[in-house]
From Swiss-Prot:
This is Putative 8-oxo-dGTP diphosphatase YtkD. A motif (Nudix box) lies at residues 53-74. Its cofactor is Mg(2+). NCBIfam families: nudix_YtkD (TIGR02705). Gene3D superfamilies: Nucleoside Triphosphate Pyrophosphohydrolase.
Length: 158
């Protein structure tokens, strides 16, 4: 297990075990690849980030992950794999979030991308991402680099 501080100095615990913090997490975050590129969305307030959000009532985390990717990017997921889970010990509440890796089959244009401006493709993620004001705070802690390392070790990405 990994432990570190997030952008707002909250303690974050990250594990690649099978749902170590909750078997019914209320949030999801989906690292997406499409045609050898990273698929992100541009949140209207936060900036660039991988798709994600809340698990709705009567919905499991996997269903939420598929829905959020579709809503925020218009993408159809070819395969979705559970990667890990993290817990943010916030000042007011605790958030548990599943991390998934999605291989995207295709992007479809939509009239509405909900609270985002739609899909954004990156050949490479910037090295100075933690200091880049165009990126969301969600992308600026250690969850992303540790998750990318795990994806490479697992052979899911090159």
């Amino acid at each position: 297990m990994y432990e570190f501080k997030d952008y707002y100095q909250n303690t974050v615990q990250l594990s690649f075990d099978d749902q170590p913090f909750s078997d019914s997490p209320k949030h999801v975050w989906v690292i997406c690849r499409f045609g050898g590129k990273w698929l992100l969305t541009e949140h209207e307030d936060r900036g660039y980030e991988f798709p994600g959000g809340k698990v709705e009532p009567m919905e499991c985390a996997e269903e939420a992950a598929l829905r959020e990717v579709k809503e925020e990017t218009g993408a159809r997921v070819k395969s979705l794999k559970y990667l890990g889970q993290y817990k943010v010990l916030g000042k007011e509440k605790v958030i548990v979030k599943n991390i998934y890796f999605a291989d995207i089959e295709k992007l479809e244009k939509q009239a509405d991308y909900f609270e985002t401006k739609g899909p954004v493709l990156f050949h490479e993620l910037p090295e100075n991402l933690s200091r880049n004001k165009k990126f969301s705070f969600i992308m600026k802690d250690s969850v992303l680099p540790i998750s990318l390392k795990k994806l490479k070790e697992s052979g899911w990405i090159e």
